[in-house]
């Protein structure tokens, strides 16, 4: 069962939290397509005037972790 991408986007835009550790494997089935997932989220954030200050992607055997800091 995957988490809802829309809930993540809502949190990234409207939550007061600015630092996130996102396990992408909780949102998509094929973790090797993580770059497409990240690009989609970045596109939405840009349209919502949320700037990415810092980001790092950690690739693990079964997980892809996206560490993200945003400015709203």
Predicted features and spans:
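Short amphipathic alpha-helical interface segments
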Residues: 1-31
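Residue-level detector of functional hotspots within protein domains
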Residues: 8, 36, 52
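N-terminal regions of proteins, emphasizing targeting and processing segments when present
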Residues: 13, 17, 45-48, 68
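Hydrophobic beta-strand residues in large extracellular and virion-surface proteins
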Residues: 22, 41, 51-52, 68-70
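Short amphipathic alpha-helical interaction segments
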Residues: 31-46
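A short, conserved structural fragment
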Residues: 46-56
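Short, cationic-aromatic polyanion-contact patches
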Residues: 56-72
């Amino acid at each position: 069962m995957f988490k809802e991408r829309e809930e993540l986007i809502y949190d990234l835009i409207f939550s007061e939290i600015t630092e996130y550790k996102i396990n992408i494997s909780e949102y998509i089935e094929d973790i090797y397509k993580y770059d497409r997932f990240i690009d989609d989220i970045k596109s939405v954030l840009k349209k919502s005037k949320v700037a990415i200050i810092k980001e790092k992607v950690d690739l693990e055997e079964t997980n892809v972790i996206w560490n993200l800091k945003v400015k709203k």
